[in-house]
């Protein structure tokens, strides 16, 4: 699960030093190619409706699990990600 790479979201993406920004851009752009209507504002509202506080990660994990149960899958170069994970990569790519 892509969320395992991000232990918390209390700060913006640039403070995640271990993030492979090139990979984030590639995955985020691939997701955005199939969701051209997505904007930084809409993705932020979708992924972080209560802000990026301590409750954000459990909420994202629940959304990821719900995506997999519902078959909302995003496939990029053989990787099977939830739609929520794809959206998160897109948002991180926009913020970096």
Where in this protein do the model-derived segments appear?
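N-terminal export signals
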Residues: 1-13
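Extracytoplasmic/lumenal soluble domains of exported proteins with redox or metal-associated functions
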Residues: 11-96
């Amino acid at each position: 699960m892509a969320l395992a790479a991000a232990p918390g979201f209390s700060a913006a993406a640039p403070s995640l030093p271990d993030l492979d920004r090139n990979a984030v851009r590639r995955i985020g752009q691939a997701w955005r190619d199939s969701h051209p209507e997505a904007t930084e504002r809409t993705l932020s509202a979708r992924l972080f409706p209560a802000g990026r506080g301590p409750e954000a990660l459990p909420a994202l994990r629940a959304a990821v699990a719900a995506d997999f149960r519902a078959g909302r899958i995003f496939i990029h170069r053989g990787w099977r990600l939830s739609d929520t994970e794809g959206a998160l990569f897109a948002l991180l790519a926009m913020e970096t």
